[in-house]
Structure formats: C-alpha cells, structure tokens
UniProtKB/Swiss-Prot annotation:
Pathway listed: Membrane lipid metabolism; glycerophospholipid metabolism
Binding-site residues, sn-glycerol 1-phosphate: 13, 162-167, 192, 212-213
Domain of life: Archaea
Protein name (database record): Geranylgeranylglyceryl phosphate synthase
Location(s) in or outside the cell: Cytoplasm
Function: Prenyltransferase that catalyzes the transfer of the geranylgeranyl moiety of geranylgeranyl diphosphate (GGPP) to the C3 hydroxyl of sn-glycerol-1-phosphate (G1P). This reaction is the first ether-bond-formation step in the biosynthesis of archaeal membrane lipids.
Catalytic activity: sn-glycerol 1-phosphate + (2E,6E,10E)-geranylgeranyl diphosphate = sn-3-O-(geranylgeranyl)glycerol 1-phosphate + diphosphate
Chain positions recorded as Mg(2+) binding sites: 15, 42
Subcellular location, principal: cytoplasm
Similarity section: Belongs to the GGGP/HepGP synthase family. Group I subfamily.
Length: 235
C-alpha cells in the first residue's frame, strides 16, 4: 500500500506565525484544490499557534499534517493525519539531523509513531531562514544532491525527500537529480512558486510541489493557479 502523499501533486504549507491574506479564511485555503495542508515554520513556532491552525483546518475534508520545528510546537490531536518531521541532511549543526529528534523522544511520551514520518531535507538557498537556522551547507553540486537523496531512501529508509529552496525558485536540474536518484521515495519541492508557470515547471521535476509564502502574501486565488499548474504538469 502506497503512502497517501505518493498521489499528491500540490501541498499548501501554512506558517502559524503568519496571517492569511486580507479577508481570507482557512476555508478559502482548503477550497483551492490542493491535495494537503502542511502546518509549520522555521521560527516562532509554539504549541498554541499550531493548535489554532489545526483546529481551523481539521474540520475540512483535506489531509492535515504538522511539521514541528521543535518539541514545544508539537500538537497531539486525533484530527491530524500525521506528523512530518524534518531532518536536514546537509545541516552544519547536527542538532537538526538527529539532535532535535532525540530531544522530542526524550521529552514527549505520547509520540504516535504510526502517524509520524520523516522528511529528508536538502536545503539549497543559503539566504533562507532555514539555511541560517541549521547552518546548512548549500554549496552542493548535482551529484551531491543526488547522493543525499539516495542516502535518505536507501540508507535511512526515508519515504520523503524534500528539496528546499525557500524564498527563491530553484534549479530544476538539482530537483531532477534528486528525483532520478530515488526509486520509491516521494520528492517534495518547495521554494519560489508564485504562479501557474513556476508550479508547472517544478512539478515536471518533482513529485509534489509545496506552496507557502504565496498563501499568506497573495491568497487563495493565487494558490489556485499553482494548483492548476501542478495538476496540468502531472497529466
């Protein structure tokens, strides 16, 4: 049985530390046609902020996952479909590869392992908050990106490889390298998707595209265009 995300073309990532576009609701976001919602952010994450967004989105007929950046942002809620836990493979600080995860296990006795999945992040924009936060080595070539993707799938058994260019549109060849290096893992791509064309282009190289800032900056109509682009590229 394949994982549910293996069938997704598009995900909206909601940052609980940011507001939605003026006049919009979470119902508007859920109605864009996206395949799933991922709730999380790099900084400013708290359990209270996470819980607010989970409560507002879980009532809608769409898969909802949270991506906790620290143990204090974990929400235990039966309405959630699961937890996507980031491991940054090219982090300069190993805390973001295994350290934070060890602390979560040590401090939280209620982890639902059946609904917990890791994302193998490869961070490639040196100007992104996540790159600074994790001290990521973003100076990678295509062979190195492919190798990281293969390590994630073959050595660590990770089902999701996440090529992250947060804040800019990435190099399609880098994304394709990760896709070519994997056999069964799903390749997520995030970064700089602002319209139909960018979603269409990046979906041709990744299994799933993730749209984040756009939902906060421009709103549901703009997100809907990216959904159309991703879906058309998948056909």
């Amino acid at each position: 049985m394949s994982a549910p995300w293996a069938e997704w073309d598009h995900i909206v990532k909601i940052d609980p530390d940011k507001t939605l576009a003026d006049g919009e609701t979470f119902q508007d976001v859920c109605a864009t046609g996206t395949d799933a919602l991922e709730i999380g952010g790099t900084t400013g994450m708290t359990e209270e902020k996470m819980a607010r967004v989970v409560e507002a989105t879980a009532a809608h007929d769409i898969p909802v996952y949270i991506e906790p950046s620290n143990v204090g942002a974990v929400v235990h809620d039966e309405d959630l479909d699961g937890y996507f836990v980031p491991t940054v493979l090219n982090a300069g600080d190993v805390f973001w590869t295994t350290g934070a995860h060890k602390e979560w296990v040590r401090l939280d006795g209620d982890i639902d392992w059946d609904r917990t999945f890791t994302e193998a992040y490869i961070v490639l924009n040196p100007d992104a908050s996540v790159a600074d936060y994790t001290e990521a080595d973003c100076n990678l070539d295509i062979d190195e990106v492919a190798a990281y993707a293969e390590v994630a799938e073959k050595m660590f058994g990770q089902e999701i490889v996440y090529v992250e260019y947060s804040g800019m549109l990435g190099d399609p060849e880098m994304v394709q390298a990760a896709t070519d290096a994997t056999e069964e893992a799903t390749v997520f791509y995030g970064g700089g998707i602002r319209d139909y064309e960018s979603a269409y282009t990046m979906r041709q190289h990744a299994d799933t595209v993730i749209v984040g800032d756009l939902v906060h900056d421009e709103g549901a109509d703009a997100v809907r265009e990216t959904v159309d682009g991703a879906k058309d590229a998948a056909d």
